From Swiss-Prot:
This protein is one of the early assembly proteins of the 50S ribosomal subunit, although it is not seen to bind rRNA by itself. It is important during the early stages of 50S assembly. The gene is rplM. InterPro entries: Ribosomal_uL13 (IPR005822), Ribosomal_uL13_bac-type (IPR005823), Ribosomal_uL13_CS (IPR023563), Ribosomal_uL13_sf (IPR036899). It comes from Lachnospira eligens (strain ATCC 27750 / DSM 3376 / VPI C15-48 / C15-B4) (Eubacterium eligens). Part of the 50S ribosomal subunit. The keyword Acyltransferase does not apply. Keywords: Ribonucleoprotein, Ribosomal protein. PANTHER family: LARGE RIBOSOMAL SUBUNIT PROTEIN UL13M (PTHR11545:SF2), RIBOSOMAL PROTEIN L13 (PTHR11545). PROSITE patterns: RIBOSOMAL_L13. GO terms for cellular component: cytosolic large ribosomal subunit. This is Large ribosomal subunit protein uL13.
């Protein structure tokens, strides 16, 4: 009997929708990253993008514990001298709540071309509505 190895042409992709309301940020991000990688499937193959598409709604209602709202800082750089910008989690949740979940999930995916390809299957929306209704996504519970 031979060991089964999935190929890019045999992978079936599903669409899932996750309601981020009442979930903790890190716990939600780790579960979403596992689905994006395909680790929830028996046909998981480390060197292939065998994950599913995930839609996250209500990103503005995600919870964080402790004093992270005031103490967690996101850094970005403009590539100019003195161009380091700092943004707290509280400011980010007010301006771009989608970016908070995207950054958390992106940090849990592999670094490199395969991780970037997996990240393209993540769709995050601040409110309860999304644009992927035509794909008929299934509700994903953790």
């Amino acid at each position: 009997m031979k060991t089964y190895m999935a190929s890019a042409s045999t992978i079936e992709r599903k669409w899932y929708v996750v309601d981020a309301a009442d979930y903790t940020l890190g716990r939600l991000a780790s579960q979403v990253a596992a689905v994006l990688r395909g680790k929830n499937k028996p046909t998981y193959t480390p060197f292939l993008d065998c994950g599913d598409n995930v839609i996250v709604i209500n990103a503005d209602k995600v919870k964080v514990t402790g004093k992270k709202l005031d103490q967690k800082v996101y850094y970005s750089h403009s590539d100019y001298v003195g161009g380091l910008k700092e943004t707290t989690l509280k400011e980010m949740m007010e301006k771009k709540p989608e970016k908070v979940i995207e950054l958390a999930v992106k940090g849990m995916l592999p670094k490199g071309p395969l991780g970037r390809q997996m990240f393209t299957k993540l769709h995050v929306y601040a409110g309860p509505d999304h644009e992927q209704a035509a794909q008929k996504p299934e509700v994903l519970k953790f």
